[in-house]
From Swiss-Prot:
The keyword Hydrolase appears for this protein: yes
Protein name, entry field: Bis(5'-nucleosyl)-tetraphosphatase, symmetrical
Organism: Nitrosospira multiformis (strain ATCC 25196 / NCIMB 11849 / C 71)
Keywords, alphabetical: Hydrolase
InterPro entries: ApaH, Calcineurin-like_PHP_ApaH, Metallo-depent_PP-like
EC number of the protein: 3.6.1.41
Length: 275
C-alpha cells in the first residue's frame, strides 16, 4: 500500500486523473491524502467532488478555504464572485448529497507523525491542541447550528489566538489559521493580505512554518494553499500547492519514500520529477 499526498486541485480534474495514472494509483490498496481546495477557479470542480466522494475510504481530505466558500455560497451566506466556478455544483442533481458529504470532511488529519492541514497551524498550537480545536469546527459544520456558523465564519478578526476566545470568534480564528494563513508574527498574529512569495513578506512576519520553536515542529505537516511558495519539502514540512490552476503543476508525494510526481498543467502531458 502506498499513500500519496496531493496538492490543491481547485477543479483541475483532467490533471488530477493524469497524476493518478502517473503514480499508478490503485484504489483497492493505495490511499490519497488531499490537502484541500478540491474546488473553485478551475474548469471541473463537479467532477473532482464526485470522483473523490466515490473513492470512499481510499481518499482522505481536509477542508480548504475554497471548499468552505462553496458551503457558504450554497447556504446563502456568501455570494459568488466573478472568478468562482461553482455554479455547476450548485445546479447539479446530486448537489445536496455532495454538499452534505463535503461538510462532514475533516479540518485536520493526524496519522502517526504526519499532520495534514490546508494552510497551517499557529505557533502556539501543539498537535494535540490543534486536534481539539479542529474538532470544534468539524462539530459546528456537521451540527444543527450549521447555518449560523456559516453566517459568522467570514472575517479577519480576531487575527490571533487567545485562550479566552469563545463562540464564533474562537471558531473563526481556528478556521482562518487552518485554511487561510500563510504568514504570521512570531507571536502568532496572522496577515491575510499577503499571497506572494517569501521574499515579499511584510516586515515583522514570516512563514508560519518558520516561526522559531513552534509547538508543532516535531511533526511533519502536509499542507497546501500557498501557490506562490511552490513545492517546499523539509524534514518536518511538505507544502504541496504548486499552482496547477495557474499553469504550474499538480504535485503528489509518496510518503513512504518522499518521491515527488508532477503533472504539468496546461503543458499537454504528465512529467515525472523526483526529489
Amino acid at each position: 500500500m502506498a499513500i500519496y499526498a496531493v496538492g490543491d486541485l481547485q477543479g483541475c480534474y483532467r490533471e488530477f486523473r493524469e497524476l493518478l495514472d502517473l503514480v499508478r494509483f490503485d484504489e483497492t490498496k493505495d490511499k490519497l491524502w488531499l490537502v484541500g481546495d478540491l474546488v473553485n477557479r478551475g474548469p471541473d470542480s463537479l467532477s473532482v467532488l464526485r470522483f473523490v466522494k466515490e473513492l470512499n475510504d481510499s481518499a482522505i481530505m481536509v477542508l480548504g478555504n475554497h471548499d468552505l466558500h462553496l458551503l457558504l455560497v450554497a447556504e446563502g451566506c456568501a455570494e459568488l464572485s466573478r472568478s468562482d466556478t461553482l455554479q455547476n455544483i450548485l445546479d447539479a442533481p446530486d448537489r445536496d448529497e455532495l454538499l452534505d458529504w463535503l461538510r462532514r470532511q475533516k479540518l485536520l488529519h493526524v496519522d502517526g507523525n504526519y499532520v495534514m492541514v490546508h494552510a497551517g497551524l499557529l505557533p502556539s498550537w501543539s498537535i494535540e491542541q490543534a486536534q481539539v480545536l479542529a474538532a470544534l469546527v468539524e462539530s459546528a459544520l456537521r451540527g444543527s447550528e450549521f447555518h449560523e456558523f456559516c453566517r459568522q465564519m467570514y472575517g479577519n478578526r480576531p487575527d490571533h489566538w487567545n485562550e479566552t476566545l469563545h463562540g464564533y470568534e474562537r471558531l473563526r480564528v481556528i478556521v482562518n489559521a487552518m485554511t487561510r494563513m500563510r504568514v504570521c508574527t512570531p507571536h502568532g498574529r496572522m496577515d491575510f493580505a499577503h499571497k506572494g512569495s517569501v521574499k515579499d513578506i511584510p516586515p515583522g512576519y514570516l512563514p508560519w512554518f518558520d516561526v522559531p520553536e513552534r509547538a508543532s515542529r516535531k511533526a511533519t505537516v502536509i499542507c497546501g494553499h500557498w501557490s506562490a511558495l511552490g513545492l517546499e519539502i523539509r524534514a518536518n514540512l511538505m507544502a504541496l500547492d504548486t499552482g496547477c490552476l495557474w499553469g504550474g503543476s499538480l504535485t503528489a508525494v509518496r510518503l513512504e519514500d518522499r518521491k515527488v510526481f508532477q503533472t504539468e498543467c496546461g503543458a499537454g502531458g504528465a512529467t515525472r520529477h523526483w526529489q
